[in-house]
């Protein structure tokens, strides 16, 4: 007898191409069979009229907490990974997650930025986007090239993180643009040596030279070619700014030449980061981004800056404060809409949210267990609705691709980006015998994102059931409050 059978749904598996009504049988957290009219089970889910698909894999999730997991569960996510910034020490982070309990599967890369902070400053900081922001009070790790001795120490710290199971190397290069190419090349060679990807926020975000986005993309592709490293580009849509078409051309050419370069994007024209990011302080920021300072909005206060002086004061006060950056007007500008389409629909590219932590009105990060989230909890709509927005808008409404191809960008493609280095991903992102029972069951016609920039903490609708390792996280559209089935995703480690 099976533990659970999901009966009579439209089962879609992007790997095999299966798209037909069938049952999915689960035993001990693993899919055992997919066929019509499978046998008896201890429990059943009636999926008639619903889509049954692999759970979504998010390569870029900064929340890494119970409230963040819960919001992403309603977005169809079953695996949420912190790969762009990463963590350090890696082993300690995984131990902390296991002790706290997680709703979704979790994992992280080895955090190069935290290796720089530990080596080049006297600061002790937590492995989080907020911790990185607080460390920006000491500009040395941000603005200066490491000495040869420091480079050796940074490389060694990262090597230890990889040995502890870090899923590659996180390179938020834009937050430490002073890092030298010698340092970066050594780390990329290390990644190639151990067969692990790198995940890069490119060094520069600018529509104009010098230090343009295209400059940074050219350097990234050069590192892929010269070191053999797999260079994964984080949030392709935002770092390219208005030059996404040229950036896409460069990436396609690199891929045709056999270089290991992959991309991800999220379906919004507004980004988010910490206010202390050095690119905001650049006197040429308006020219480089093509926006004014009023495009930068403090998340907690919902306040837009009026001048560079006001921005600099905020950076001095709390560099870790989260902000929104409104860089594309996709609602009113058809040219901007086309740019976003180029990145979101890039062939072979993954959908990834760049979900950020939930912040309360007093500026603190919310890590509690209240459900629904507190009324004053804010983040970015992408933290709630990235995958449902993509499937609703790009797939169902605009029909830019078929449903099975749209689902592949949320499931199989991110799994394949990771699986050469992380064998656990061979069992995720697909539905078939032997695969992990990470499954989303949704009403395709009702699937929709509800979060916007006026109400960011509204959960998406349309996910009727969500299973993580065969355990229910969402049941009949409601959250299972005590569910903590999340398991670590980790490279082999000592």
Model-derived features: positions:
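Active-site neighborhoods of metal-dependent hydrolases
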Residues: 116-177, 221-225, 230, 234-403
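Short, acidic/polar
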Residues: 64-70, 150-159, 216
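C-terminal cap of metal-dependent C-N hydrolases
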Residues: 341-349, 354-374, 439-485
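Metal-associated gating/positioning segment near the N- to mid-region
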Residues: 38-42, 46-101
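Acidic, glycine-enriched loop/beta-strand segments at the rims
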Residues: 11-23, 330-334, 397-408, 416-457
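Histidine-rich, glycine-flanked metal-binding segment
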Residues: 1-54, 449
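Divalent metal-dependent hydrolysis catalytic cores, especially in the metallo-beta-lactamase
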Residues: 70-91, 103-114, 162-176, 195-206, ...
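Divalent metal-coordination and catalytic microenvironments
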Residues: 9, 29, 49, 60, ...
